[in-house]
Amino acid sequence: MTTWGLLFLLWPATTDTQACPRPCTCQSLETMGLKVNCEGQGLTALPVIPAHTRQLLLANNSLRSVPPGAFDHLPQLWDLDVTHNPWHCDCSLTYLRLWLEDHMPEALMHVYCASPDLATRRPLGQLTGYELGSCGWKLPPSWAYPGVWWDVSLVAVAVLGLILLAGLLNTFTESRN
């Protein structure tokens, strides 16, 4: 019976390490999670990361961006190392910046940009929204909204109504006198 009990306890660890992305190595942690080590593998894109990952080591690769939502399926992730990658710090890195701000704010000062020129050799945490770029997002001028014209029309009608009401009151009071 003890053999079956041990097998039952080790089953999650073996299934987690079988889902390990190539060329990374995976190790089960005592905290029922997974350590995924992809350091120095020359990765240019994120591999598919197992859902039970608690530690993810992506340092010393060739990663330039992180797709939006890349870590959203990893609720147990508490240690992420993305240092020493040639990050292209434009709006495509906004997701990584926001994720790090929420989960590991101290790491923002250790993630350095390789490009564009405006951001080269600067920590991701020091960049402003302007420096990250807009990705083509542009707010239309405030007069472009149809709601603004509706508001202006309502104000004009209200003012005209008040003028008419004042005129009627004035006429009514003059006729009584």
Swiss-Prot record:
It is a single-pass type I membrane protein. InterPro entries: Cys-rich_flank_reg_C, GPIb-IX-V_Complex, Leu-rich_rpt, LRR_dom_sf, LRRNT. The keyword Membrane applies. Residues 85-137 form the LRRCT domain. SMART domains: LRRCT, LRRNT. Residues 17-51 form the LRRNT domain. Residues 169-177 are cytoplasmic. Keywords: Blood coagulation, Cell adhesion, Disulfide bond, Glycoprotein, Hemostasis, Leucine-rich repeat, Membrane, Signal, Transmembrane, Transmembrane helix. The chain crosses the membrane at residues 148-168. GO terms for biological process: blood coagulation; blood coagulation, intrinsic pathway; cell adhesion; megakaryocyte development; positive regulation of platelet activation; release of sequestered calcium ion into cytosol. Glycans are attached at residue 60. It comes from the Eukaryota. Residues 1-16 form the signal peptide. GO terms for cellular component: glycoprotein Ib-IX-V complex. The GPIb-V-IX complex functions as the vWF receptor and mediates vWF-dependent platelet adhesion to blood vessels. The adhesion of platelets to injured vascular surfaces in the arterial circulation is a critical initiating event in hemostasis. GP-IX may provide for membrane insertion and orientation of GP-Ib. Two GP-Ib beta are disulfide-linked to one GP-Ib alpha. GP-IX is complexed with the GP-Ib heterodimer via a non covalent linkage. This is Platelet glycoprotein IX. The lineage of its organism: Eukaryota, Metazoa, Chordata, Craniata, Vertebrata. The gene is Gp9.
